Swiss-Prot record:
It comes from Campylobacter jejuni subsp. doylei (strain ATCC BAA-1458 / RM4099 / 269.97). This is Homoserine kinase. One of its GO terms (cellular component) is cytoplasm. Catalyzes the ATP-dependent phosphorylation of L-homoserine to L-homoserine phosphate. The gene is thrB. ATP binds at residues 84-94. It holds the Pfam family GHMP_kinases_C. One of its GO terms (biological process) is threonine biosynthetic process.
């Protein structure tokens, strides 16, 4: 079997831990029954020996496969990782969702996306990345009694993303330590209103309001202080026809959204201006993970 799982960009400014969308940048994993266990890694992490010794995908896969099938079989895992690691593009969510869905498939069970999403919550307790990795599109989610409830909206085909990827790993755990311990009532209301309005902009295609709807007072500034150049990335994007520009997840990547022609032009300008960073033009994925 082969499974493709997309990269994701979460939070989107004010939608902390609840908003996210799916990008056409995929991790590809092939799994085959084998006489002996083996792992092959290409792309991101291929030079990391620890990913072969203690692989999270493999660990989750076997945990669920053995629970579902009652068997202890050997498999050959072939990873082609295209999602940058620890850059705020959902690499951990792609691993979790991919492992769970693969285990269900290889155990002979029906792969139901709602079930996969609920089970993924066990391994990542906020749905902002795992939901779009599972469902695709723009997704608004909440958690109630250990279950994920999501509403998905397909993203307009006229839009595209420009993602700026610094050469700085930033784990979610590390990034959360930078967050303020207390939040004022006014700032809480600010984020609630902006996250709600941002969601409505995507649902109703009111893209002209995204620039101010995507503002945040909860997490972005504190996280961006770890890499001050990101403030310039955001300013430059908004001055060059980006409809919105936000920290991607916990960082260090930065996500900008624009109409396709503007996004292509912005990507070229970004690459020229920010020579030390990788810049990718990406279209949006509306399917979530797919088993081939």
């Amino acid at each position: 079997m082969k499974i493709l799982v997309p990269a994701t960009s979460a939070n989107l400014g004010p939608g902390f831990d609840c908003l996210g969308l799916s990008l056409k940048l995929f991790n590809e994993t092939q799994i085959q029954k084998s006489g002996v266990f083996s792992i092959s890694i290409g792309g991101e992490g291929s030079d990391n020996i620890f990913l072969k010794k203690n692989n999270i995908f493999v660990n989750i896969f076997y945990e669920i496969y053995e629970k579902l099938s009652g068997k202890k079989d050997n498999f050959r895992f072939i990873f082609q990782n295209n999602i940058p690691l620890s850059r705020g593009l959902g690499s951990s969510s792609a691993v979790i969702v991919g492992a769970i869905a693969s285990a269900y498939y290889m155990s002979g069970f029906k792969v139901e996306k709602k079930r996969i999403l609920d089970e993924a919550l066990i391994y990542e307790n906020h749905p902002d990345n795992i939901a779009p990795a599972t469902l695709g599109g723009f997704v608004c989610s909440l958690v109630e009694k250990n279950k994920v409830y999501s509403i998905k909206k397909e993203i307009d085909k006229d839009l595209a993303a420009v993602v700026v990827i610094p050469n700085l790993a930033m784990s979610t755990e590390q990034s959360r330590q930078a967050l303020a311990k207390n939040l004022s009532f006014n700032d809480a209301v600010f984020n609630l209103s902006h996250a709600s309005f941002l969601t409505a902009c995507f649902l109703e295609k009111k893209y002209e309001f995204l620039k101010f709807a995507s503002q945040d007072k909860l997490h972005e500034i504190n996280r961006m202080k770890n890499l001050p150049e990101l403030f310039e990335v955001q300013k430059f994007a908004l001055e060059n026809k980006a409809l919105m520009s936000t920290l991607s997840g916990s960082g260090s990547s930065f996500f900008s959204l624009a109409f396709k022609d503007d996004a292509l032009a912005l990507a070229k300008k970004m690459q020229t201006k920010f020579k030390d960073f990788s810049v990718q033009y990406l279209e949006f994925d509306d399917n979530g993970f797919e088993i081939c």
